[in-house]
Structure formats: C-alpha cells, structure tokens
C-alpha cells in the first residue's frame, strides 16, 4: 500500500471516529446540531439519541476495521472493502439527505480509491 493510500485511508478512519464521537458521545452538542442540521430539542429526544448511538457504533467499527487493514494486517482488500462501503453510504446519503455528503463523507474515501488505482 502506498504512503498516499495509507494517509488517505487513515483520514477516512479518523473521519469515522469523529462521526462516532458526534453520534454516540456528543449527541446533543452544538457540533452535532450543526453537522446534522437538527435542533437541540430534536437531538434530545430519546428515540433520536438511541438511533444516533446505534449509528455511531457502525461508524466506529468502520474506523476500527480500516485501522486494522492499514496498520495491522496490511490488507489492501480490507481497506478497499471498507472504503467502498463508505462511498456507497455517502452516495446513498447524497441521494436521500444532502448532496454535500458525497464530498464531506465520500470525498476522502473516493480519493483513497483513486490512490489505490494509481499508486497501489
């Protein structure tokens, strides 16, 4: 795996740890309200908090498995699988929620795939 791919895939992992933080730890924070464009009253609803925390675990696991693939197993296949997963989720989010998601969430993942194609 090239150093460029390693750096970009690490950025994708860190981004998902940050999303985990917002969704599972800072559920009712100003940052979470801004990122997800929801008011604090909505974020305080138990059903919303529960859904966010559940989604946060998925994002943390994406980060964990990317770090595992990059630094422990040195498996390009694992990195590709999880980066494609991120691109798929970002594409769905762009189609159903906010078009900017494809750049914000998907951008680093797309750059990672491109770096794999060009630099492996």
Regions found by a protein language model. Give the residues of each.
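N-terminal signal-anchor transmembrane alpha helix
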Residues: 2-26
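Structural signature of hydrophobic alpha-helical transmembrane segments
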Residues: 73-84
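Cytosolic, membrane-interface loops and tails of multi-pass inner-membrane proteins
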Residues: 25-48
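Interfacial helix-start motif at the membrane-water boundary
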Residues: 43-61
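C-terminal ends of transmembrane helices
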Residues: 21, 88-100
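Core segments of transmembrane alpha-helices
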Residues: 12, 56-67, 109
């Amino acid at each position: 795996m090239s150093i460029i791919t390693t750096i970009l895939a690490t950025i994708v992992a860190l981004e998902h740890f940050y999303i985990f933080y917002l969704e599972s730890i800072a559920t009712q924070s100003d940052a979470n309200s801004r990122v997800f464009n929801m008011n604090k009253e909505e974020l305080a609803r138990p059903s919303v908090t529960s859904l966010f925390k559940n989604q946060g675990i998925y994002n943390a696991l994406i980060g964990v498995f990317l770090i595992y693939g990059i630094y422990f197993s040195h498996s390009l296949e694992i990195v590709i699988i999880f980066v494609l997963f991120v691109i798929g989720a970002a594409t769905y989010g762009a189609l159903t929620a906010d078009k900017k998601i494809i750049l914000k969430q998907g951008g680093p993942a797309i750059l990672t795939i491109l770096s794999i194609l060009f630099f492996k």
